[in-house]
């Protein structure tokens, strides 16, 4: 999924005797919607780069088709050249990982276009070998070790310059308890522990109409309520440092990272009281492996699994064997299960349509093993009503705190906030893009680490900032010095102060902050003009001027619009050839 918000920003290129320009580059960025963080960024960087001798020739805010043809879909011949020859120099963009961080899919040297998504054209044998170890590590401590090694390499090499880690803002009832926020946006959190003292009903505002009703074919908006109905073998658990823990499975084990034996809780039942067993798991997984169902990650799943991969050992035990090692095999076990006795016989291509029909006419069919079940979908009034799953406590051990949960489609931000202020709504979705100063008094808000980051992607085949062959002291080390200089000239504090809508944290490496493997020991590249000039000089660029260096004195109109989220969400299991 891609949401893009950019605006063309005019600039004046500084030349003449005021500043010494060693070379010029071009900036590339999407131009979809106005008033984003890159509006602020572009105003600052075009003033800062000339201070270290880098001029801006052109800032190209273009549509995705144009951008794709200069980056991941470049038609050749390869490598992707600089901007003036049809490629790019620096590309301003945001990336996000839904769940599991897999940098090899972006930076492995074998995956440069046309073979993959490494449009950075970054090549480092040490990175490749470390990424191999990471992707084949199936013990969590080993993954953590290799993940931090990868971040150390990216921190040193800077194939891309990570600008910021944005946070999501959720306004909510001041007494809300039990919300573990990191996975809510990814529709990976169940609400059985949510509570507000003295309240038995919870209401949530969404900015989109209800459209998807089958849990294995849904988006974020419908995913948040469908997630309360269904359940998986494993889950990502914020209370376990965002690692995998058992849900419907009582245990899972592997001796080689390829074959997993899974024990299912024998007490688990569906919301109609029917026993949940291994045949339901087999049914769900074979559904996703059936081309007629058109599962969005079908290509990735069929790379590692076939129908023969799932073997039922007994009613509550099965074995799943992967055809080859993959990053995070547990991720396959976080898929929500659907009841075979409800869905068996429905044509594979008709699941989504059937789910919508049942939601409107017979909601008792929309059941899973989650804490809640569908009581009503009111199409005319635009709300979803969930009630407790009466069997959930019997196998899970505790009952959901709320008796009823409502999800309302509320069209505008102001309406949603007014409803929160009046007590009609208990929580407002982050997609309304609400600023801190808009949160009603008497309510609260939570800022949540996200799965995304903003960056300046570098063309590592650019002769100066990539290969360094055209630097006065030619070589890759000089290119690295130039990239370090650029990183130190980004005025992150100025940009954060000018943005004023969301809390941004300084970007360090291209790994999201909500990853359990994020290395918080790495230090940001603080703004330091002296250090930036020093790195330029190490690359052979000698500054002649001895005049005082101008300080940052930018006047930027505070942004009052959406938090841009110019983010391509990357599922490591599926190449996304163009944003949608």
Where are these regions (language model features)?
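Periplasmic-binding protein-like
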Residues: 11-13, 37-41, 146, 150-164, ...
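Extracellular/periplasmic solute-recognition and catalytic clefts
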Residues: 94-95, 288, 311, 375-387, ...
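N-terminal lobe/hinge region of extracytoplasmic solute-binding protein
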Residues: 205-255, 286, 367
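Long beta-strand-rich cores associated with HINT superfamily self-processing modules
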Residues: 170-201
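Aromatic-rich, solvent-exposed beta-strand/loop patch
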Residues: 34, 190-193, 250, 255, ...
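Extracytoplasmic/peripheral linker and loop segments enriched in polar/acidic and small residues
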Residues: 18, 24-29, 33-34, 56-73, ...
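Surface-exposed binding/hinge segments that line
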Residues: 175, 298-351
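Structural transition elements
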Residues: 17-19, 24, 29-41, 138-140, ...
């Amino acid at each position: 999924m891609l949401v893009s918000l950019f605006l063309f920003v005019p600039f004046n290129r500084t030349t003449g005797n005021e500043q010494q320009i060693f070379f010029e580059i071009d900036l590339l960025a999407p131009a979809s919607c106005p008033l984003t963080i890159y509006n602020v960024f572009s105003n600052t960087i075009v003033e800062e780069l000339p201070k270290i001798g880098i001029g801006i020739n052109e800032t190209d805010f273009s549509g995705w088709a144009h951008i794709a043809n200069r980056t991941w879909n470049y038609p050749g011949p390869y490598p992707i050249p600089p901007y003036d020859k049809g490629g790019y120099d620096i590309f301003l963009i945001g990336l996000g990982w839904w769940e599991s961080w897999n940098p090899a899919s972006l930076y492995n040297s074998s995956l440069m276009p046309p073979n993959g998504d490494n449009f950075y054209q970054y090549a480092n044998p040490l990175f490749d070998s470390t990424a191999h170890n990471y992707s084949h590590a199936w013990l969590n401590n080993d993954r953590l070790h290799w993940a931090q090694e990868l971040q150390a390499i990216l921190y040193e090499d800077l194939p891309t310059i990570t600008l910021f880690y944005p946070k999501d803002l959720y306004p909510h009832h001041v007494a809300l308890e039990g919300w573990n926020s990191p996975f809510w946006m990814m529709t990976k959190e169940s609400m059985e522990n949510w509570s507000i003292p003295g309240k038995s009903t919870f209401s949530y505002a969404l900015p989109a109409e209800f459209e998807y009703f089958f849990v294995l074919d849904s988006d974020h908006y419908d995913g948040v309520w469908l997630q309360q109905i269904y359940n998986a073998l494993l889950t990502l658990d914020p209370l376990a440092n965002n690692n995998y823990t058992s849900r419907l499975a009582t245990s899972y084990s592997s001796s080689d990272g390829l074959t997993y034996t899974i024990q299912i809780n024998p007490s688990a039942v569906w919301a109609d009281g029917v026993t949940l067993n291994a045949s339901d798991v087999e049914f769900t997984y074979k559904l996703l492996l059936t081309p007629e169902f058109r599962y969005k990650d079908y290509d990735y799943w069929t790379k590692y699994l076939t129908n023969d991969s799932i073997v039922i050992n007994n009613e509550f035990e099965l074995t799943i064997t992967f055809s080859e090692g993959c990053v995070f095999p547990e991720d396959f076990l976080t898929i929500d299960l659907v009841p075979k006795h409800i869905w068996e016989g429905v044509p594979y291509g008709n699941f989504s349509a059937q789910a919508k029909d049942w939601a409107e006419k017979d909601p008792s069919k929309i059941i899973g093993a989650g804490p809640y079940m569908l009581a009503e979908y009111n199409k005319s009034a635009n709300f979803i009503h969930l009630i407790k799953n009466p069997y959930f406590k019997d196998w899970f051990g505790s009952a959901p705190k709320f008796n009823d949960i409502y999800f309302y489609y509320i069209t505008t931000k102001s309406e949603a906030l007014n409803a929160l202020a009046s007590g009609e709504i208990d929580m407002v979705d982050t997609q309304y893009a609400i600023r801190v100063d808009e949160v009603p008094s008497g309510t609260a808000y939570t800022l949540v680490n996200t799965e995304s980051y903003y960056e300046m992607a570098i063309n590592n085949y650019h002769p100066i900032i990539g290969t360094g062959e055209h630097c006065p002291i030619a070589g890759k080390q000089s290119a690295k010095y130039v990239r370090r200089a650029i990183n130190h000239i980004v005025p992150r504090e100025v940009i954060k102060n000018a943005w004023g809508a969301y809390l941004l944290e300084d970007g360090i490496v291209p790994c999201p902050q909500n990853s359990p493997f994020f290395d918080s020991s790495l230090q940001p590249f603080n703004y330091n003009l002296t250090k930036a000039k020093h790195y330029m000089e190490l690359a052979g660029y000698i500054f002649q001027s001895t005049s005082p260096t101008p300080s940052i004195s930018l006047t930027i109109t505070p942004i009052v619009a959406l938090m841009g989220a110019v983010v391509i969400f990357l599922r490591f299991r599926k190449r996304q050839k163009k944003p949608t």
